[in-house]
Amino acid sequence: MKDTFVEKVDDFVRQHDVLKERSTIVVGVSGGPDSLALLYYLLEKRAAKQFEIVVAHVDHMFRGDESHEDLQFVQDLCKGLGVICETIRINVSQYQKQYGMNAQVAARECRYAFLERIMKKYDARYVALGHHGDDQVETILMRLVRGSTPKGYAGIAVKRPFHNGYLIRPLLGVTKEEIVNYCNELKIIPRIDPSNKKEVYTRNRLRKYVLPHLKEENPQVHEKFQKFSMQMQEDEAYLQELAFEKMNKVITKKSDKQISLSIPTFESMSMPLQRRGIQLILNYLYEYKIPSSLSSIHIDKVIEFFKRTQPSGSLDFPGDLKIVRAYEECSFGFKQEIVSPFLQDLSVPGTITLSNGDKLVTEVSEDIPSDMNETVFVAKYNDISYPIRIRSRENGDRMSIQGMNGTKKIKAIFIEAKVPREKREEWPVVCDASGNIIWLPLLKRSAFAISKETAKKDKYMIIHYKSKESSGRIMK
């Protein structure tokens, strides 16, 4: 039986290219049968494969003396085996309250942070965990019942990037029963976590009431679920590539904390790519630390939000992420503090940097720019009173418009241009020393501006609006 177990794991490791020879492996060991079976399997292969083994154990301090005894058990075991052992006690309940998350998510974050630290300390290539085939079945069932993303429905990955190496699960090809039999043959007496039997947890109920029926239908059901998982992961990788490619054409603006997209262009994508496109945006903005409260329901909400007939509105997501729609554009970004009114003099020539990182640059020239687009303002030097002043908008602001009699409200210009309300407060209003509004960058020039057609040889004051926005590409 022992040889059969080892051979099955060998085949699985080889088939999925799980780990390479001459590697340092950090093994997560709780003291339970799964992690002990993994440790003993790797120790059996250590000499032939030239593995360096480091054991890592986390006491989450959920079970008082009992969990502390687990830690001591792992330390004593490693001492007897002559294996390096790194342990830590973490008050996960305190961490949970501090960051407002559920116990399982808090424990996972603390545990993975410790594993990453140990991986770095020993320059390890792999972190190995003891998830097995039954875990895979339970995970996929649980996500189907609760709802998840397409990536989530694929279940547990055999191998995925982690820190500067990989997180691997060599036992996904074997069942819990095979693991227990392997431990019995080696006369290993593992620690048992009583919480694994509590029926308050969905996973435990699936394990007790659903999994046995599936195994009655097919004793090798875990292999079918593993095959399903691999196919889902392969399909998902392809669709992710397509979504990434498409989204880089949909995105109109991108900064570290904000992404804007064109709704009509986004809606031209197929629904599978739309869902994945939203997920890519969330991954980028949350820096892959997606809040546990975020689910596929939120992605569906965004897609429904785009289909509404109202031209504007907003959604609030976990972690202070706000999604704001303004006509045919939608912006995803983190809530910012209220923009304070601003006033700043701009020398000629000179440069100022605006709060959003964009710049206004002035120059004096006898020639006008060849490209007189919305980012350029040109006036006769002597028609303007100096200094130039850059300020935030004020109630009642009006300006004379180039080629039009009378004046127009700045508010009306913003509305016509479909500028979102939150952007209006930080939009620069360019005035002269007499208080005349001479330019609303990117939107309207005043009657002080000259056109390319009417320009003659003269001395001109020129203002350029230079955006710091990077290209609309998102990170994978």
UniProtKB/Swiss-Prot annotation:
GO biological process terms held by the UniProt record: tRNA modification
Q: Which residues cross the membrane?
A: none
The record's GO CC annotations read: cytoplasm
Its domain of life reads Bacteria
What are the entry keywords?
ATP-binding, Cytoplasm, Ligase, Nucleotide-binding, tRNA processing
Which Gene3D superfamilies does the UniProt entry name for this protein? Answer: 3.30.465.60, HUPs (3.40.50.620)
Where is the protein found, in the record's own terms?
A: Cytoplasm
Its Enzyme Commission number?
6.3.4.19
This chain's protein is named tRNA(Ile)-lysidine synthase
Q: Which organism is it from?
A: Bacillus anthracis
The taxonomy runs: Bacteria, Bacillati, Bacillota, Bacilli, Bacillales
